[in-house]
Amino acid sequence: MGKILVTGGTVFVSRFVANYFAQKGDDVYVLNRNSKPQLPNVTLIEGDRNDLGDKLKGYEFDAVLDITAYTREHVEDLVNALGKFGDYIMVSSSAVYPETNPQPFTEDQDCGPNVHWGPYGTNKLAAEEYLRQAVPHAYILRPPYLYGPMQNVYREPFVFECAEAGRKFHIPGDGSMKMQFFHVEDLCRFIEILLEKHPAERVYNVGNLDAVTISDWVRLCYDAIGTDLETVSVEGHPQRAYFCFHDYDYYLDVSKQIALMPDVKPLAEGLKESYEWFRQHRDGVIRRSYMEYIDTNI
């Protein structure tokens, strides 16, 4: 049993990660402001990561899982506030790759601004750069779109609600835009492998091996509920006004991940798990007005 610090621990990825390792028998601590209900099987360290002071100096962790680092300052403040620790794993983002890079994106490509992600991507990159200098043995993970139980972002839940209501689904263009996903449990499994095997590589793209078109992803969401899908092609409207992803076709080379973890959860299976969680936790999703835009403008 290890002693693990998870930053966050109250919503989606950080909550799932904390729960995953706690259920494995690890001694899990979560660092957050205590503004939301806590998991029952973790120890809370109440604090704002922007103002930690000496809250962490009395602790010694086998691993730090930094799920909520969005800026250089986030990483710098946490690293400086920690006492003794072993491994450090930061969940970064594929948004660090410029959209002009050849695809699939590989870990050895240059990183920089991406017009679709803006400051989110450049801030993640600055956080990565500081971490690599301050903690050379740290691991950095660059996922595409994460999904699965505890999802609070209105992505697959949006499609689920359209399917439940028997709505036609409004697809951007011909539906051929490709996206890549990674189940949050697979993220946890890969973190577990890093902690066990300590491979020499320090930066990993993570994700499903294959990208999927919008049309196929929506169909899988409808299939998860058992609802027939009828689509309407949309042109001439801003995509983010009526759809839950940017107008941005990209995917990652995840061969380094696959070498360590060959099996990942099939998207169809993962979406069924997502729907089962959503059915029981509808109030945990932050909704956006996609349906209202469609009904009023399309």
Predicted regions and their residues:
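Glycine-rich Rossmann NAD(P)(H)-binding loop
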Residues: 7, 148, 172-177, 204-212, ...
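Alpha-helical substrate-binding/gating segment
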Residues: 160-170, 177-212, 219
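NAD(P)H-binding glycine-rich loop region in Rossmannoid oxidoreductase-like domains
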Residues: 34-90, 96-98
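Mid/C-terminal beta-alpha module of Rossmann-like enzyme folds, strongest
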Residues: 193-245, 249, 282-284, 288, ...
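Active-site "gating" loop of Rossmann-like NAD(P)-dependent oxidoreductase/epimerase domains
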Residues: 93-118, 133
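Conserved beta-loop-beta element that borders a ligand/cofactor-binding pocket
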Residues: 128-150
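C-terminal amphipathic/interface module of NAD(P)-dependent oxidoreductases
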Residues: 247-298
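N-terminal Rossmann NAD(P)H-binding glycine-rich loop of SDR-like oxidoreductase domains
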Residues: 4-24
